[in-house]
């Protein structure tokens, strides 16, 4: 398990033009995928959550006991299958691709491509979503009732069963409210401690839970659950719960925080004035033109067109029925290109075909 933040450029794929399609990456993906993708076998046949990880252009299933745990060096595809009407047998889908902050452009492109492939496999019924580490949508976070856990490195390092006596220290930060608890690994430095949150210092056979004086009950409870799970995996490990103000500076918890800090690049997304853009392909090239700003409602959308609705904290691509035949991958790419020109390039992207269910979109056009 990696202990410090990886030195590679974070969100390196962000500045890519995502020119995956027709590229060597696409050819490699198609070659590995062949006629059918074996990972999709059985996908979408019953309600529930399925997760896959991208490994060398291939889609590999992510174990159910690892659901909610992601590594920042990896990319994942998440499929949620549900019944909009409990009285009906009809199934609906949301398919997300999640990109870690240290994920490569190839992984980003492969995840995006494979998400479109899964959409096609499910007869174009899913709503597609792009999720970026630290900027996940509320819909995505709500899948994981125990909260999201983001760890350093790739899953390859995570699956090595390191003996506790050889374990490299790590500091886990628990933040959020109610069901929206976010757990992520941070540098081993005292400056990262926040009185409003809870932390776990994992030293292998010694575990400390540090409760900030202003932390919430939900954060403390989540950390306690996490600590219990760690102890079940390491029966010989000893755990101690520490309170912020009553723990002396000489305590091993503090003296163990000897790492090097790294800048925290995650900045909260902020709701901004709505911006509605129309996508056209005049001259054979996709381009966007602003239609309006401010309040947007259903009457602003036409079945013969494609629109981007940018709310600052989210980006929606609405595809009219008359444009379904156009390659869906293009809609992810055009929204990615649009966001690159804004101050919120990592906002969640939702691709919605006319008539599909998307609660966040309905809220956005009703505001």
Swiss-Prot record:
Belongs to the villin/gelsolin family. The keyword Phosphoprotein does not apply. Keywords: Actin capping, Actin-binding, Calcium, Cytoplasm, Cytoskeleton, Developmental protein, Repeat. Gelsolin-like repeats lie at residues 56-141, 179-225, 287-322. One of its GO terms (molecular function) is actin binding. It comes from Lumbricus terrestris. GO terms for biological process: actin filament capping; actin filament fragmentation; actin filament polymerization; actin filament severing; actin nucleation. It holds the Pfam family Gelsolin. Residues 106-109 are annotated as: Actin-actin interfilament contact point. Its main location: cytoplasm. SUPFAM superfamilies: Actin depolymerizing proteins, C-terminal, gelsolin-like domain of Sec23/24. Expressed in circular and longitudinal muscle, pseudohearts, pharynx and gizzard. Also expressed in male germ cells at the proximal pole of primary spermatocytes in 16 cell-stage morulae, and in the distal parts of the spermatocytes in 32 and 64 cell-stage morulae. In the spermatids of the 128 cell-stage morulae it is expressed at the proximal pole of the elongated nucleus and the distal pole near the base of the flagellae. PANTHER family: SEVERIN (PTHR11977:SF130), VILLIN (PTHR11977). This is Gelsolin-like protein 1. Residues 1-185 are annotated as: Actin binding. Residues 186-295 are annotated as: Actin binding, Actin-severing. Calcium-regulated protein that binds to the plus (or barbed) ends of actin monomers or filaments, preventing monomer exchange (end-blocking or capping). Can promote the assembly of monomers into filaments (nucleation) as well as sever existing filaments. It is found in: Cytoplasm, Cytoskeleton. Residues 235-257 are annotated as: Disordered. InterPro entries: ADF-H/Gelsolin-like_dom_sf, Gelsolin-like_dom, Gelsolin-like_dom_sf, Villin/Gelsolin. Coiled coil: none annotated. Residues 296-366 are annotated as: Actin-severing, Ca-sensitive. GO terms for cellular component: actin cytoskeleton; cytoplasm. Interacts with actin monomers and filaments.
């Amino acid at each position: 398990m990696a202990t410090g933040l990886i030195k590679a450029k974070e969100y390196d794929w962000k500045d890519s033009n995502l020119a995956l399609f027709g590229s060597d990456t696409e050819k490699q993906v198609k070659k590995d995928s062949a006629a059918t993708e074996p990972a999709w076998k059985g996908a979408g046949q019953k309600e529930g959550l399925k997760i896959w990880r991208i490994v060398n252009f291939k889609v590999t299933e992510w174990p159910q006991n690892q659901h909610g745990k992601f590594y920042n060096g990896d990319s994942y595809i998440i499929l949620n299958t549900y019944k909009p009407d409990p009285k009906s047998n009809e199934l609906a889908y949301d398919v997300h691709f999640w990109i870690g902050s240290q994920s490569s452009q190839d992984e980003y492109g492969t995840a995006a491509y494979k998400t479109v492939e899964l959409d096609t496999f499910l007869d174009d019924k899913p709503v597609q979503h792009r999720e970026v580490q630290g900027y996940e949508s509320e819909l995505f976070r709500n899948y994981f009732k125990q909260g999201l856990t983001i760890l350093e490195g790739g899953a390859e390092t995570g699956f090595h069963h390191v003996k506790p006596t050889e374990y490299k220290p790590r500091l886990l930060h628990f933040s959020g409210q109610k069901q929206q608890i976010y757990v992520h690994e941070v540098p081993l430095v005292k400056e990262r401690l926040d009185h409003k949150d809870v932390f776990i210092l994992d030293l292998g056979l010694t575990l400390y839970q540090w409760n900030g004086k202003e932390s919430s009950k939900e954060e403390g409870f989540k950390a306690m659950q996490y600590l219990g799970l760690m102890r079940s995996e390491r029966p010989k490990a000893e755990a101690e719960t520490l309170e912020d103000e009553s723990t002396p500076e000489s305590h091993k918890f503090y003296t163990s925080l000897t790492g090097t800090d790294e800048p925290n690049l995650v900045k909260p997304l902020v709701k901004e004035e709505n911006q509605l853009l129309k996508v056209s392909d005049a001259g054979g090239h996709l381009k966007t033109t602003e239609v309006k700003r401010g309040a947007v409602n259903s009457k602003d959308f036409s079945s013969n067109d494609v629109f981007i609705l940018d709310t600052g904290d989210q980006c929606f691509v609405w595809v009219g029925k008359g444009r379904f035949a156009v390659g869906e991958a293009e809609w992810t790419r055009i929204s990615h290109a649009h966001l690159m020109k804004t101050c919120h390039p990592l906002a969640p992207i939702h691709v919605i075909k006319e008539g599909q269910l998307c609660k966040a979109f309905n809220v956005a056009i009703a505001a």
